[in-house]
Amino acid sequence: MAEVLVYVDHVDGAVRKPTLELLTLARRIGEPVAVALGNGAADTAATLAEHGAVKVLTHDASEYADYLVVPKVDALQAAHEAVSPAAVLVPSSAEGKEIAARLALRLGSGIITDAVDLEAGDEGPVATQSVFAASFTTKSRVSKGTPVITVKPNSAAVEAAPAAGAVEALSVTFSAQATGTKVTGRTPRESTGRPELTEAAIVVSGGRGVNGAENFAIIEALADSLGAAVGASRAAVDAGWYPHTNQVGQTGKSVSPQLYIASGISGAIQHRAGMQTSKTIVAINKDAEAPIFDLVDYGVVGDLFDVVPALTEEIKARKG
């Protein structure tokens, strides 16, 4: 069976959930070979093996932390030369999509971004994408070179499948471009205790209808009662009510949680583009004609200032 390269997203050896989802999808089309880079790379091996990696290629160098994405592209290119894989899978984060695009260019290959499913095909892996605000589902394959595919978080359930997970050192020669853009400093974000927006199983978002930064407290309260991440529409972000890092939509982040609750969001196509692949969508809006209701599984026509606090209290009561 052909091998499939999986780029590992980890923090000092702690593997992030989207990578485990990639391993599940990779097993459908071949044998997963994980590529772990940077500090703690070797510490990822046990987790990766538990979830199906037959091999774990590791390489640690200061360049991965000191410079932007090019060193990681160099490493993936080296892994591609060592393995000759059937495909390369990368998490569909902002960094992941840049890595994938640069790698595809170097390999002279095609790229598919924001896939929500993956299956084996007679002529190579077939990726499913949700497009035009979930109006259509497309199936695509790369017709030239090794397919490079980014997959959206929450596209697959994480499934354990113990494998050998043999650790091998990857030999990497960095290109001249690798050190072209140096990281001069990092400012840690203040922790809210909530899950990462793009990885959360539940997302509660507020829009123009929240009508003020101070009113986002009721959105946060509902999110905290559910253990959810907080999102915001572009209108809310542009008004200065919530940080841009929490914006969901075409010019923000793309999410695909199990449950998405839209409060006071009309449902412009730009917002829908960022949450259309959510498994279950609930909308709360006092305008019964709001476009968001065309997309939802469950809709509540009502004032969010009445509905959201009542929902929060009911959830708390049921949780005891």
Predicted region positions:
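N-terminal glycine-rich FAD/FM-binding segment characteristic of electron-transfer flavoproteins
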Residues: 1-320
